[in-house]
Amino acid sequence: MDVDQAAIDEILASAEADTAEGRIDRLEKELDVLKGSVKKLLLDLRETLNNLENPFQNLQNLAEGALAGGASYQPPQIQVVPAQIPEPPKPEPEVEQPETETGPEPEPEAEPELKEVKEDEPPEEDVVRELDESKSAEPIPEVMEEVDLEGDSLQAYSFEKPVKRTTPKTADLITKYDIVTLFNLMEWVKGMLEKYNLDSLTLMLELFESAGYISKDARDFICKIAELVSLNDGFEDMLLELYRLHKLMNPADTSMDSKLLSLILDKRL
């Protein structure tokens, strides 16, 4: 029986490949292949990046290749052609025109404009007449002043323009107190009268006015409240009667209603 040596070698090789050492060798070979591929890829990538960073490198490589390919290559020569300077035009000879008898040149028509300006201006007689009328319309008062110089009396005439003096209209300014303020003032006056007499309260108010804290009208108003409260004990009833008087005099005015209602709800009335 003939034994096929090739088959035996293949079987042995496969058996060796199945061992751990064979597998390690196979992995090392595959790893070397991968390393080579990765190294080549990195080199290509590096070259690409260099070209991007330095684009003139490609031109340099092309120039070197061109020099290596053909040493007899010569760059094209540039011929410089001098520009022609244009000659200045020759002056044309002046042609003498025959002198002809011409009339005098007409002067510019400036006189009509002057005439128009003069026509716009009013005549002097009208101007004098207008001034006389203005003087007669606004008479200037004649003021005679006497000046005494070392006993000698001299009379000096001066013309002054009347000055219009407007006297300001004095409007009666009335300070209006609402019902809540009036109630608070009455309550304060009642408390002060429980501590001091009426004369002391009046002097205190005069002193407060002299200090500049209240006006004379306010002082008189509080003094009247003090006289009223000193004569009657129940100022709350008097305030209600004043409210009724206000409604009788001004039935359409409702400004006091809400404030009086707030006093009643606060049980102060």
Swiss-Prot record:
Bias (Basic and acidic residues) ranges: 112-136
Compositionally biased intervals (Acidic residues): 94-111
Coiled coil: 3-66
Stretches the record annotates as Disordered: 83-142
Keywords: Coiled coil
Protein name: Uncharacterized protein AF_1053
Taxonomic lineage: Archaea, Methanobacteriati, Methanobacteriota, Archaeoglobi, Archaeoglobales
